[in-house]
From Swiss-Prot:
This is Pentatricopeptide repeat-containing protein At1g62670, mitochondrial. The keyword RNA-binding does not apply. PPR repeats lie at residues 44-79, 80-114, 115-149, 150-184, 185-219, 220-254, 255-289, 290-324, 325-359, 360-394, 395-429, 430-464, 465-499, 500-534, 535-569, 570-604. It is found in: Mitochondrion. Its main location: mitochondrion. Gene3D superfamilies: Tetratricopeptide repeat domain. One of its GO terms (cellular component) is mitochondrion. Residues 1-22 form a transit peptide. One of its GO terms (molecular function) is RNA binding. SUPFAM superfamilies: HCP-like. It comes from Arabidopsis thaliana. GO terms for biological process: RNA 5'-end processing. Belongs to the PPR family. P subfamily. Keywords: Mitochondrion, Repeat, Transit peptide.
Length: 630
């Protein structure tokens, strides 16, 4: 029965053209050009028929396949179209779709007519290359020549629709298959189910399984694998479990792939214990875990800080002679680094190298981070240079890690050198890169360079975020440049970016420390109008400002308001008020505050104890105050 398709207008423009844009096959790629020249130069000593045998095709490499094509088109008479289709199919299985398309063009140029099979292969290749209009054009030409597409051809086209984000047309295609007498097979249904999950249509995908069964097409392991994978990626692990039980109750036995998918989904959605239970369950059922199973569990355990459990799993997999891969080692190394166990991380790295497993960029970046955290910056730089020598080129994350290390330990100039080196390698720093540098330069007291880097960031098209502005404002305020900070703050308020409570706290503190307590108080009072609730830092900053100004009553009133507002005072609030009372000579009020502070679980800080000690020496206080603070 002939099926009628509405070929899109974009495809119709291609129908009269040849299979691909005209041109020499050598234009496909430099490597293909070499293979092509080889195919038509010199004589070969083998018979193409021998190479086209089943065993010959299974061992065929791309350059040999192209050379074989050259031999075939030189033969007279031409080999049969069936033999050409065998070769094109073999190359398509290598995922060399461009090569297949180009060879198909050459066949047409040489007058070798395509048939149903070669057209189907070409449609599949165009779809796999996300060139759906060209696939539709080939379909149109194929049908014009009287060839009816079969279910394999239509399944390829279906895949093209799914990957071209034309999912409604994909669904319509399957519906039309039924109407016109085609019987979609498992591959067809699996393709559409996968496409539906790709486009967040999980309910439609699940409903399609029931429709599939109703049409007499039983789901296979691939079907369940696609569905389980789709559900787990959405976090629907309960539904995935239900499907697993359904499989076990039926004739299908879920293998390690299905279990791995669910375990990985459970890990990603923080159901660690469920993942471990499923791991035990698969073992009791005789399903042997593989490196993927262990790697998922180890990575998840590491993310939870359960590095000892992760280490036990690593030992377990080695005992079972399941070789850990770079992903397994990298996850553990990163976990040890974050736990501050750099020695253990280095031992794992040595073990990895001993096993001839090439470290990845993640492995190197984790170790560089570890060295930076422990102020072993020279070793971090050596590791950085070593990874480059191994042709494992650092990305922006690696550079950021090293730059942050140098800035943290006051070696900002070296951090700047790394930043410039990154630019020379053609990598553009991201927002995090610039934030690190701006903060490092301010901490080093180089306000001018910090501002220059901010300007460079904007001119390079790297978008500042609220953290950038907070860093800039904090640096300017702490370096006594309140007026410049005010200009930046006013610009920020006019922009679409929302200042956070941290932003306001920076400005309130900057104003108070610059003696502009009233300005700080105005900004504090306006917080509620901006929809921002003051936090304990905001209250403490303002209380400290009032105390510094000598406005004792305002400080007391704000302290009372703070508690009434439901914001619990912290150690800083109490110590600030205690010191203010002691300086005013109000020993009774300070003693009451000390008792209240101690009842809340806080103790005197270094500044308060230092003040009390000095007053003891001066004879202005007795020892009982020091005892109360201890």
């Amino acid at each position: 029965m002939r099926i009628s398709f509405a070929i899109a207008s974009t495809a119709k423009r291609f129908v009269h053209r040849s299979l691909v844009v005209r041109g020499n096959a050598a234009t496909v790629s430099p490597s293909f050009s070499f293979f092509w020249r080889r195919a038509f130069s010199g004589k070969t000593s083998y018979d193409y028929r021998e190479k086209l045998s089943r065993n010959g095709l299974s061992e065929l490499k791309l350059d040999d396949a192209v050379a074989l094509f050259g031999e075939m088109v030189k033969s007279r008479p031409f080999p049969s179209i069936i033999e050409f289709s065998k070769l094109l199919s073999a190359i398509a299985k290598m995922n060399k779709f461009d090569v297949v398309i180009s060879l198909g063009e050459q066949m047409q140029n040489l007058g070798i007519p395509h048939n149903h099979y070669t057209y189907s292969i070409l449609i599949n290749c165009f779809c796999r290359r996300s060139q759906l209009p060209l696939a539709l054009a080939v379909l149109g030409k194929m049908m014009k020549l009287g060839y009816e597409p079969n279910i394999v051809t239509l399944s390829s086209l279906l895949n093209g629709y799914c990957h071209s984000k034309r999912i409604s047309e994909a669904v319509a295609l399957v519906d039309q298959m039924f109407v016109t007498g085609y019987q979609p097979n498992t591959v067809t249904f699996n393709t559409l189910i996968h496409g539906l999950f790709l486009h967040n249509k999980a309910s439609e995908a699940m409903a399609l399984i029931d429709r599939m069964v109703a049409k007499g097409c039983q789901p296979d392991l691939v079907t369940y694998g696609v569905v389980v994978n789709g559900l787990c990626k959405r976090g629907d692990t309960d539904l995935a479990f239900n499907l697993l039980n359904k499989m076990e109750q039926g004739k299908l036995e879920p293998g390690v792939l299905i279990y791995n998918t669910i375990i990985d989904g459970l890990c990603k959605y923080k159901h660690m214990d469920d993942a471990l239970n499923l791991f035990k369950e698969m073992e009791t059922k005789g399903i042997r875990p593989n490196v993927v199973t262990y790697s998922s569990l180890i990575s998840c355990l590491c993310n939870y800080g359960r590095w000892s459990d992760a280490s036990r799993l690593l030992s377990d997999m080695i005992e079972r002679k399941i070789n850990p891969d770079v992903f397994t080692f990298s996850a553990l190394i990163d976990a040890f680094v974050k736990e501050g166990k750099l020695v253990e991380a280095e031992k794992l790295y040595d073990e990895m190298v001993k096993r001839s497993i090439d470290p990845s960029i993640v492995t190197y970046s984790s170790l560089i981070n570890g060295f930076c955290m422990h102020d072993r910056l020279d070793e971090a730089k050596q590791m950085f240079e070593f990874m480059v020598s191994k042709h494992c080129f650092p990305d922006v994350v690696t550079y950021n890690t090293l730059i942050k290390g140098f800035c943290k330990y006051k070696r900002v100039e070296e951090g700047m050198e790394v930043f410039r080196e990154m630019s020379q390698r053609g990598l553009v720093g991201n927002t995090v890169t610039y934030n690190i540098l701006i903060q490092g330069l301010f901490q080093a007291g180089d306000c001018d360079m910090a501002q220059e880097i901010f300007k460079e960031m904007v001119s390079d098209g790297v978008p500042p975020n609220i953290m950038t502005y907070n860093t800039l404002l904090d640096g300017l305020c702490k370096n006594g440049k309140l007026e410049k900070a005010m200009v930046v703050f006013e610009y920020l308020q006019r922009s679409k970016m929302e200042p956070t409570i941290y932003t306001y706290n920076i400005m309130i503190e900057g104003m108070c420390k610059a003696g502009k307590v009233e300005d700080g108080w105005d900004l504090f009072c306006n917080l509620s109008l901006k929809g921002v609730k003051p936090d304990v830092v905001a209250y403490n900053t303002m209380i400290s400002g009032f105390c510094r100004k000598g406005s004792k009553e305002e400080a007391d009133a704000l302290f009372k308001e703070m508690k009434e507002d439901g914001t619990l005072p912290n150690s800083g609030c109490y110590n600030t008020l205690i010191r203010a009372r002691l300086r005013d000579g109000d020993r009774e009020a300070s003693a009451e505050l000390i008792k209240e502070m101690r009842s809340c679980g806080f103790a005197g800080d270094a500044s308060t104890i230092g003040l009390v000690t000095n007053m003891l020496h001066d004879g202005r206080l007795d020892k009982s105050f020091l005892d109360m603070l201890s």
